[in-house]
Amino acid sequence: MKHYDFFPSGALTLNGRIGKALAKNIRCRLETLNYALMVDPFRFRSEDDGAWRCEFWGKNVRAAILAWHLMPSDTLLQKIKTTVKDMLSTQTPDGCISSYPADKQISGWDVWGRKYVLLTLLRYYRLIEADPAILQACCRLVDHLIGQLTGEKADLRTCGMHDGLASCSIVGGIIELYELTGEKRFLDFARSLIESGCSLKENVFDAALNGVAPKDIGNAKAYELSSCFEGASIFYRITNELRYKEAVEKYFRAIVKNEIFVTGTAGGKDDCGEYWFDGVKNQVSADPGCGLGETCVTVTYMRFCEAVAALNEYDQSPFDEMENSLYNALLGAMNPSGDRWTHANPTPLTGGGWKASPPDQIKRWFNTPFDEHDCCRAQGPEGLAFGAAHAVLKLRDGVMINFYEDFLLHDTTASGEKYSVEVSEDYPASGKIELFFNSTRPLMRKIVLRIPAWAENCELSLNGENIAVHAGKYCILERIWSDGDSVKIDFKPKVKVIRPADTEDVFALKYGPIVLAASGKNDVVPKPDNIFEPFADGCGKIVNFKQGEIVLCDYASAGAKFSPDDPLRVFFEEKRIFDNE
């Protein structure tokens, strides 16, 4: 069990940048999708070309369920219920739910697609309707898969893509199913996958424990590999087998150290930016020879951060990482209309890179159009909803606040006492927040506040009395709260110079959690040691700064035209400062 959970649907209202982006994505994307079309490959078992149409239903509907949980809408709820019923109608008497014809099943991306169906049905069961028919369908789906693993295909690592990583990443869903049913056969199946190491190349968990660099684990496919480690985190929480906790934590530390860009995404090596490749060092290259930062990797990294956070009650570093990804790479990947997402992110980050909406992925690779679907266009909404859902979390005896989005929370204690918590002040732009507690009578509650690692000079007061806090540590206020109690936090952000490890003469700039970018074709380089002045008239929707004639805005807003005529720059070369003087 995790030490936190989501609040009931509708209890939390997000009013800031994240909430507004989520509302737009619901309205402009999730409520407009043709869900029936995404079910068709399963109904007709027509995916005979080895493609991955099978992932789009699960990815999109899973995101829609969590988005609905945060922002209830009759329109979206009806679409979700209709399409879930539609998907269940494709399950044959043997339990199979697959988009692949019988003779091609458990090859290609088939099990990967089944994974997303399983995860979506489980989320539906947890967040919308605990219908026994849903759980029964999940059991039959997994039992059918287990029954197919015989003879030459007895080892799931031999079935599918990336040396087994894609197929074996279903392990997290298998363990979730065990949690809900208590059926030992599902735990046994999950154990067999975990103990196989999930890759034909090697046991990826042993590799992490032995300190192997992420780029050398398995085939280094960041999305699939990290999904297997997410499954290992869930496995540890069920079995308490310490080696898997240690493997997950070592892998997390290794990718933070070696792979995560300043913007909170990662990935390179191919055109789409899909592989671990010493990203910290290579993100500053003017010619990386690949795309940088697949949005699917951003979202998977955010999910993996949460899987790490679930291992330790008060280790906030995974949420520090998630905040960076959420406010920069993830928000920056959604186009202003709210219906499209970048695949690879701007390449290079040293200037000239621009945000681009990807084409129909199935048409591109298989010459058969599929409603302009793309894996990252399907995954982006999950990242947005997932990040929003972890801004404020329910504790057994209180509230955990990770991201200081303006919000209003209405909660009820176990004994039926109602209270509310409200946060305002337009974080992160203002660098400050004010929290108000309201209740009809005094209540014992715990309010846990994340103090970001970058906020070294943070000041916090409770009802006007200063309380010592430490950057990178949660502040735990466990007390009897009265109506009108208030907390003020001044994070005291300033523009900081970021010089990635193992790089020379290159720097980026951050204001609190926000990466600053130069939008447009201006090649003038700011002086890192000079003062940056905030101003109101720039293109940034979160922050704008200038230094003389040099204008910078938040990375999420930069390059908003999604056009080669609107490039952006994140990294600046120090030697060019002198060239410009």
In which residue ranges do the predicted regions lie?
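Catalytic-core region of carbohydrate-active enzymes that cleave or remodel glycosidic bonds
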Residues: R237-N258, D287-D339
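Low-complexity, Ser/Thr/Pro/Gly-enriched N-terminal "stalk/linker" regions
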Residues: M1-F56, D74-S98, P132, R191
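Short beta-strand segments within Ig-like beta-sandwich modules, predominantly Fibronectin type-III
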Residues: E465-A471
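Solvent-exposed loop and edge beta-strand segments that line ligand/cofactor-binding
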Residues: H3, P41-W57, S98-V117, T150-C168, ...
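C-terminal beta-rich recognition modules with glycine/proline-rich loops and embedded aromatic residues
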Residues: A190, V248, D320-F436, H470, ...
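Well-ordered alpha-helical scaffold segments within catalytic/enzyme domains
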Residues: G10, I18, N60-D74, Y116-D131, ...
